[in-house]
């Protein structure tokens, strides 16, 4: 049962200060957002779409700062509440349906704590570092490239030499955002969390990306029967990065969810036609320069050399189609090719799937051709043979990856689907993604209606994510349930007591229809079903 509408509408207060959790003190970036041009939708009504999403998240319990009742809790850690957890689970189920099972992938679940040598082999101990600068007056530490990006509005490649980044800081007269003090020369900070394991104090690390689990587990998977290439391995789980200045809610975290796909393939063998024929006609929105966008089919992109590898074109098509299927407007998506100084240290070629938001273009998926970098590195450090055998020859598998940020994707879903219609706010998530699928409401709290509504709720709660909502006027309850995205409200009224029918209200249209209680499960199952895979 959800808290009352009154409780929801009051919002929540910071127990430490009595201030609203959405105050400027707690979230200094609020109110500093400029909407990019050329967009339609919710963000055109207000440049404060981020504020609206944060307000919704905190008031309704989608997500909120971890350990918020304690002073001094570290930034960059957020907890999902009941609605956020349900939305995350729905999103992951959609990923499993439209990416994992659609392509016949093999899903694993690896440990988040890994041996030091894993990251010696992967290069993370040496190269996984951000450029930082310190204020010489107050001592505050900042990501140097982010400060420059905020000042200039241009992307600053992380791999630029530290001296060049510092020269840009001086040229642009960038000072400390906190106190206006002068900034120090740029140095590097490794973002991995180091651990001491057991009484012996064995050095280990929290994984900075889930894919390393897939690489070190590949040999076991290969030897236990999954030996046909391409071999797409995938994993959903948590990764950890000791970010310098995490902020903006779910967009920059120290602990975060990833859904990663690592496709191991024979570089001398073409992609099978079964896969290719399914997606070669998918329209890709490619941006080679970060400005213009070319719309071209996956097949044309490969034949014209815009995307060098057929397997690369196929998986770019797969991931773009996934976001379109879950309701992201194609016109708000682009696949941006990264320049040489933007690519990760392990990548031969990189694309970012980005979605347009009130904060500008936001990266959701890193799509990298990693070559044999990873498996060759692990062979060298571990001493184990990770070669595969295919058509009479041995080879080191190459890798193409789709590294998805789940938390960021959830933020985008909220922003793109939060709509104001007059005085009504509606979270128009696709019904199959809604955290609460159906609400059961007695028209009034008397005359046997609550008892009958409870019977209906008990009938539905096992098969659907259902809630029972009573107390306020029916209009107030509808408004509250619209805001959290409930697609269907089942109202038990006086006619129900006469003929065993209920009113089903559609969230998006507000239209109502009578449905028999005996046929209600089948009606909801059809209305809430995941779209058919094509």
Model-identified regions with their sequence ranges:
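Residue-level detector of transmembrane insertion/anchoring sites
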Residues: 9, 15-16, 22, 397, ...
């Amino acid at each position: 049962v959800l808290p009352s509408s009154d409780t929801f509408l009051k919002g929540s207060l910071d127990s430490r200060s009595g201030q609203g959790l959405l105050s400027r003190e707690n979230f200094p970036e609020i109110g500093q957002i400029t909407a990019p041009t050329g967009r339609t939708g919710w963000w055109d009504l207000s440049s404060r779409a981020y504020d609206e999403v944060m307000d919704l998240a905190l008031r309704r319990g989608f997500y909120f700062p971890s350990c918020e009742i304690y002073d001094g809790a570290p930034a960059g850690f957020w907890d999902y509440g009941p609605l956020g957890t349900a939305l995350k689970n729905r999103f992951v189920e959609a990923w499993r349906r439209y990416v994992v099972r659609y392509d016949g992938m093999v899903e694993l679940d690896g440990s988040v704590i890994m041996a030091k040598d894993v990251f010696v082999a992967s290069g993370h101990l040496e190269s996984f570092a951000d450029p930082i600068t310190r204020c010489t007056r107050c001592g505050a530490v900042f990501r140097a490239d982010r400060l420059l990006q905020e000042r200039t509005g241009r992307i600053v490649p992380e791999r630029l030499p530290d001296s060049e980044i510092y020269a840009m800081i001086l040229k642009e007269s960038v000072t400390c955002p906190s106190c206006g003090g002068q900034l120090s020369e740029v140095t590097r900070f490794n973002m991995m969390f180091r651990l001491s394991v057991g009484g012996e104090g064995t050095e280990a690390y929290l994984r900075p990306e889930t894919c390393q689990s897939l690489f070190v587990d590949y040999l076991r998977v290969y030897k236990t029967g999954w030996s046909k290439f391409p071999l797409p391995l995938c994993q959903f789980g948590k990764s950890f990065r000791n970010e310098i200045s995490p902020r903006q809610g779910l967009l920059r975290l120290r602990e975060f969810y990833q859904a990663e796909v690592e496709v191991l393939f024979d570089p001398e063998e073409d992609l099978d036609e079964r896969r290719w024929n399914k997606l070669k006609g998918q329209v890709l929105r490619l941006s080679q320069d970060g400005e213009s966008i070319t719309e071209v089919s996956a097949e044309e992109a490969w034949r014209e050399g815009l995307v060098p590898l057929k397997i690369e074109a196929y998986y770019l098509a797969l991931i773009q189609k996934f976001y379109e299927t879950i309701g992201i407007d194609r016109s708000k998506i682009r696949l941006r090719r990264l320049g040489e100084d933007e690519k990760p240290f392990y990548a031969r070629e990189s694309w970012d799937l980005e979605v347009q938001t009130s904060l500008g273009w936001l990266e959701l998926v890193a799509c990298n051709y990693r070559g044999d970098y990873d498996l060759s590195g692990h062979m060298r450090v571990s001493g184990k043979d990770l070669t595969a055998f295919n058509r009479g020859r041995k080879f080191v598998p190459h890798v193409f990856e789709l590294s998805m940020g789940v938390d960021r994707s959830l933020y985008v879903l909220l922003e793109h689907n939060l709509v104001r219609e007059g005085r009504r706010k509606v979270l128009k998530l696709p019904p199959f993604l809604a955290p609460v699928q159906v609400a059961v409401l007695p028209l009034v709290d008397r005359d046997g209606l609550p008892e009958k509504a409870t019977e209906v709720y008990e009938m539905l709660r096992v098969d659907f994510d259902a809630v029972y909502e009573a107390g306020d006027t029916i209009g107030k309850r509808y408004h509250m349930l619209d805001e959290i995205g409930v697609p269907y409200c089942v109202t038990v009224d006086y006619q129900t007591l006469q003929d065993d029918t209920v009113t089903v209200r559609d969230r998006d249209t507000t239209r109502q229809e009578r449905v028999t209680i005996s046929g209600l499960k089948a009606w909801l199952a059809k209305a809430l079903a995941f779209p058919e895979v094509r």
